[in-house]
Amino acid sequence: MKFIIKLFPEITIKSKSVRQRMVKILQGNIRNVLQKVDETVTVRNDWDKLMVSSKNDSPENRDKLVERLSCMPGIQAFLEVTQVPFTDLHDIYEQTAAVYGPTLANKTFCVRVKRKGKHEFTSIEIERYVGGGLNQNFPSNGVRLSHPDLQINLQIENELLYLVTAIHKGLGGYPLSTQEDVLSLISGGFDSGVASYLFIKRGSRVHYCFFNLGGAAHEIGVKQVAYYLWSKYSQSHKVKFVSVPFEPVVGEILEKIDNGLMGVVLKRMMMRAASRVAERMGVEALVTGESVGQVSSQTVTNLSVIDRVTDTLILRPLIVSDKQDIIDQARAIGTQEFAETMPEYCGVISNKPTVKARYEEVLANEAKFNFDVLENVITSAKVIDIREIANETEAQVQEVETTSALAENEVILDIRSPDEHEDKPFNPEGMTVIHLPFYKLSTQFGDLDQSKTYLLYCERGVMSKLQALYLKEQGFNNIKVYRQN
C-alpha cells in the first residue's frame, strides 16, 4: 500500500532551507502518527512530495491510514497509488487497462499524466495512446476532456508507473510545530474550539487553558473538546491542558466590581492569569475565539481595554467571522456536538453591560479587587499532559464499574456519533444495544428506563469514561463503562 503526499502549496514557495525544515518536520509527524496505527509504515522524502508505504494492505488498515492523513496539517492532498515497473508505452497502456478498463462502462473518461525523468515519449503522448487504446478496446461513452465521469490519473517517475486509485483532500496548512506554540483559552463552546483548530492547522502546537466556572461537570466537558482536537488533528506532538479554578475570582468580581464592568473585568482577570501560565510554559501568545460585536465585552473599545492588561500577544483568528460561519466550521471539524451540549456558566451577569468601558473607570474598579484571590487561583492551576486525560479519567472513574459482560437488566448504550455508529455498527450477539450519541446524554439519558443499568460504550473508551463521570455528577448511579475483551 502506497500514498503520495502532496505538500501545502505555501511550503513549496519557501526558501530551500525553510522548505527542507518544514518537509522534514512533516515527514516526522506522519511517521509518528501512522506508526501508532501500523508499525510497518515508512515515510520517504522525495523533495516535492513524500512517499508513505505500508506492508499491511488490509482494508481496515487502509481506512485508518486515510483517516489519519486527512487530518494532518501540512498535507494539501494525498494520492492512493499502485506502484508498478513498466518497459515501454504499450506496457503503460496494458497495466492501465487492467485496472481501469472494466470500470469504463457507460462513462465518459479522460487520461491525465504527470511525468518525471527522461523518456522517449511526452506526457501528452501517453495520454493520447492510453486514452485511445481504452476507447477502442472497452465499452464506454467516449473520451471527454472537460468534466468526464472518470478521470484516470497516472504518475510516471523514471521507470515506475503509479496508478492513482483515489485522491484524498488534505487539511492544508503548515506542518505541526513549524510555527511557535500558543496557549488557547478554551471554554468548550463553538468559538474557542474553532480558534484552536485554526492555529493547529496553521502549524502551531496549541496548549489549552481552561477557566473553570462550573465545577467538575464543566471541566469534564471542556476536556472532551480539548482531547478530541488533540487526538484528531495534532497527536503527533505533546501538549498541555491547564485548568484554573476561577470560581473565587468570579465571587470577588460579583462582590467588588460595578455591574456594568463585570464582563470586561472578568476577561482582564482571565488574561492576567493566562499570561502568567503562558510565561511559565515559555509560550508567547494567547488565542481566543472572540469576534467583534458578538457580545458586549467584544466591542473594539472593550477589547482594547482588555488587551491593555498584558504585554502578551493576544491572537483572535475569528475576529471578523460571522457566528453561523463559526458554527458551520465547528460542524466540519467535529466540535459542534460538544459545543451544543456544553453546560453554560454565566458566572458574571451584568444587567446593563457596558459596550464602551472607560479605561480609568476599569482601573478604579480593579483597585477594589483583592488580587490575592487571583494569585491563589493561578498558584492552584493544574497542568497535565493532554495524553493523561485518559489516564486521569481512568483513576476518577474507579467508582464507576468497568465490565466486559452483560448481566440481567443491563443494556449497552452506544454513545458514539451517528457517523461512527453507521461506519462500524456495534451489535454483539445476545446483548441489547441502544444508540444514544454522547451529545444527547445530558438531555435524554433521564428519559431512559431508570430501572435498568446502562453500560456506556465507545471505541477508544475515553469518551465513555468522561461521560460516565458527567452523568455521575448529575446524580445518576445506574451507570457502568463497557469495555470489549
Curated annotation (Swiss-Prot):
Identification of the protein by name: tRNA sulfurtransferase
One GO MF term: tRNA binding
Family in the record: Belongs to the ThiI family.
Residue ranges of every copy of the THUMP domain listed in the record: 63-167
Keywords carried by this UniProt record: ATP-binding, Cytoplasm, Disulfide bond, Nucleotide-binding, Redox-active center, RNA-binding, Thiamine biosynthesis, Transferase, tRNA-binding
Disulphide connectivity of cysteines: 346-458
Catalyzed reactions per annotation: [ThiI sulfur-carrier protein]-S-sulfanyl-L-cysteine + a uridine in tRNA + 2 reduced [2Fe-2S]-[ferredoxin] + ATP + H(+) = [ThiI sulfur-carrier protein]-L-cysteine + a 4-thiouridine in tRNA + 2 oxidized [2Fe-2S]-[ferredoxin] + AMP + diphosphate; [ThiS sulfur-carrier protein]-C-terminal Gly-Gly-AMP + S-sulfanyl-L-cysteinyl-[cysteine desulfurase] + AH2 = [ThiS sulfur-carrier protein]-C-terminal-Gly-aminoethanethioate + L-cysteinyl-[cysteine desulfurase] + A + AMP + 2 H(+)
Domain Rhodanese: 406-485
Enzyme class (EC, first level): transferase
Binding positions (ATP): 185-186, 267, 289, 298
Principal cellular location given in the protein's record: cytoplasm
Pathway: Cofactor biosynthesis; thiamine diphosphate biosynthesis
Active-site residues annotated for this sequence: 458 (cysteine persulfide intermediate)
Pfam families for this protein: Rhodanese, ThiI, ThiI_fer, THUMP
Lineage of source species: Bacteria, Pseudomonadati, Pseudomonadota, Gammaproteobacteria, Aeromonadales
